[in-house]
Amino acid sequence: MSNQDYKVADISLADWGRKEIKIAESEMPGLMETRREFAAQKPLKGARIAGCLHMTIQTAVLIETLQELGAEVRWSSCNIFSTQDQAAAAVAANGTPVFAWKGETEEEYWWCIEQTINGPDGWKPNMLLDDGGDLTAVIHEQYPDMMKDIYGVSEETTTGVHRLYEMSRKGELGMPAFNVNDSVTKSKFDNLYGCRESLVDSIKRATDVMIAGKVAVVAGFGDVGKGSAQSLRGLGAQVWVTEVDPICALQASMDGYKVVTMEEAAPVADIFVTATGNYNVITHDHMKAMKDEAIVCNIGHFDNEIDVASLKQYKWDEIKPQVDHVEFPDGKKITLLAEGRLVNLGCATGHPSFVMSNSFTNQVMAQMELYNNPGKYEKDVYVLPKHLDEKVAALHLGRVGANLTRLSEEQAGYIGVSVDGPFKPEWYRY
């Protein structure tokens, strides 16, 4: 490996990965159309992007889109279990410095991020693309002198966006940041429709359990929780929801879910899913109260929504990779998936390509906006303008056979919009 500018599990998986990438491209019209529109202009020529985002097949299509638009890219995964090794191999074999494999240790995880920051021949990033905020944090904490040369960061997920707003509030944000998560075509699609498909896929792959008839608890009823609850109910589970926010709790009630506390649910439910972005949502006491063989998993970004650390004192029995029995002193076992990390990427392959095309097209738009407009943005957090959000949606309509109605000039004037959009004000909630 000493003379190779990548580290993956098995480079021989590249051909398999390339075949899967080709299939994904047909399901990712937003990215492919963006390539066609901008490839000749090379709007990212000169951009040196350090990326830290789940190294999946879909991410491979994102990486190669950025490269088609002129960027140099170095990449790591933002989760120790989320890499698809065939995807990493295919990207590495194509000449991209990628440092990611499924089952990294914590130490290896941080080493991989480090490789994306410091490349050969003095290579340093001038753009960041992050998921969860770890790359951004490393730059701020360990490489503050580098920030003067970085145009900005685009952040993928709710947790990372929260970290950015906290840094901004404290005056600690050292570069402009785009909150990609809160583009409508990300949060209302990836977070909701993506989780609606990938959660049950991961539980099924991990356990083969019958979901119908089970009591399933979803902690958190944001977009991720909404999609998770829908998926479990769709397979016949009785779905309960825990919430701290009265608005979300009322939404859950109006959607027909029973809103309970985790203390009420713990002794009764069969399946537990955390989707809050908070920590210690399922505590040691909750797990002690659970039934034998209860299934416990997390679909939020970090692994601390479930107090997994408190379980280390007990006996663990690995059933298969990312599926563990944890045995309590009384002999009761719970089934913990992906060690409390993102279950849909630890036990399955994440969201489908089509919905990730929405999210990743937003990422490309954000990268182009930041790189091509130096000095336009302060060291603060921004969202993409409405017309770009609508453009991302429009790029995907043909793939699902949707035909838009066009306003007449009179109709557009009546509601005070252009016939070409944007069609909603910035504050519209969808």
Curated annotation (Swiss-Prot):
<dbReference type="Pfam" id="PF05221">
    <property type="entry name" value="AdoHcyase"/>
</dbReference>
<feature type="binding site">
    <location>
        <position position="243"/>
    </location>
    <ligand>
        <name>NAD(+)</name>
    </ligand>
</feature>
<feature type="binding site">
    <location>
        <begin position="157"/>
        <end position="159"/>
    </location>
    <ligand>
        <name>NAD(+)</name>
    </ligand>
</feature>
<dbReference type="InterPro" id="IPR020082">
    <property type="entry name" value="S-Ado-L-homoCys_hydrolase_CS"/>
</dbReference>
<keyword id="KW-0520">NAD</keyword>
<comment type="similarity">
    <text>Belongs to the adenosylhomocysteinase family.</text>
</comment>
<dbReference type="GO" id="GO:0005829">
    <property type="term" value="C:cytosol"/>
</dbReference>
<feature type="binding site">
    <location>
        <position position="344"/>
    </location>
    <ligand>
        <name>NAD(+)</name>
    </ligand>
</feature>
<dbReference type="InterPro" id="IPR036291">
    <property type="entry name" value="NAD(P)-bd_dom_sf"/>
</dbReference>
<feature type="binding site">
    <location>
        <position position="191"/>
    </location>
    <ligand>
        <name>NAD(+)</name>
    </ligand>
</feature>
<feature type="binding site">
    <location>
        <begin position="220"/>
        <end position="225"/>
    </location>
    <ligand>
        <name>NAD(+)</name>
    </ligand>
</feature>
<comment type="pathway">
    <text>Amino-acid biosynthesis; L-homocysteine biosynthesis; L-homocysteine from S-adenosyl-L-homocysteine: step 1/1.</text>
</comment>
<feature type="binding site">
    <location>
        <position position="131"/>
    </location>
    <ligand>
        <name>substrate</name>
    </ligand>
</feature>
<keyword id="KW-0378">Hydrolase</keyword>
<dbReference type="InterPro" id="IPR000043">
    <property type="entry name" value="Adenosylhomocysteinase-like"/>
</dbReference>
<feature type="binding site">
    <location>
        <position position="156"/>
    </location>
    <ligand>
        <name>substrate</name>
    </ligand>
</feature>
<dbReference type="GO" id="GO:0006730">
    <property type="term" value="P:one-carbon metabolic process"/>
</dbReference>
<dbReference type="GO" id="GO:0004013">
    <property type="term" value="F:adenosylhomocysteinase activity"/>
</dbReference>
<dbReference type="Pfam" id="PF00670">
    <property type="entry name" value="AdoHcyase_NAD"/>
</dbReference>
<protein>
    <recommendedName>
        <fullName>Adenosylhomocysteinase</fullName>
        <ecNumber>3.13.2.1</ecNumber>
    </recommendedName>
</protein>
<dbReference type="GO" id="GO:0071269">
    <property type="term" value="P:L-homocysteine biosynthetic process"/>
</dbReference>
<feature type="binding site">
    <location>
        <position position="190"/>
    </location>
    <ligand>
        <name>substrate</name>
    </ligand>
</feature>
<feature type="binding site">
    <location>
        <position position="186"/>
    </location>
    <ligand>
        <name>substrate</name>
    </ligand>
</feature>
<comment type="function">
    <text>May play a key role in the regulation of the intracellular concentration of adenosylhomocysteine.</text>
</comment>
<keyword id="KW-0554">One-carbon metabolism</keyword>
<feature type="binding site">
    <location>
        <position position="56"/>
    </location>
    <ligand>
        <name>substrate</name>
    </ligand>
</feature>
<dbReference type="InterPro" id="IPR042172">
    <property type="entry name" value="Adenosylhomocyst_ase-like_sf"/>
</dbReference>
<dbReference type="InterPro" id="IPR015878">
    <property type="entry name" value="Ado_hCys_hydrolase_NAD-bd"/>
</dbReference>
<feature type="binding site">
    <location>
        <position position="278"/>
    </location>
    <ligand>
        <name>NAD(+)</name>
    </ligand>
</feature>
<feature type="binding site">
    <location>
        <begin position="299"/>
        <end position="301"/>
    </location>
    <ligand>
        <name>NAD(+)</name>
    </ligand>
</feature>
<keyword id="KW-0963">Cytoplasm</keyword>
<dbReference type="GO" id="GO:0033353">
    <property type="term" value="P:S-adenosylmethionine cycle"/>
</dbReference>
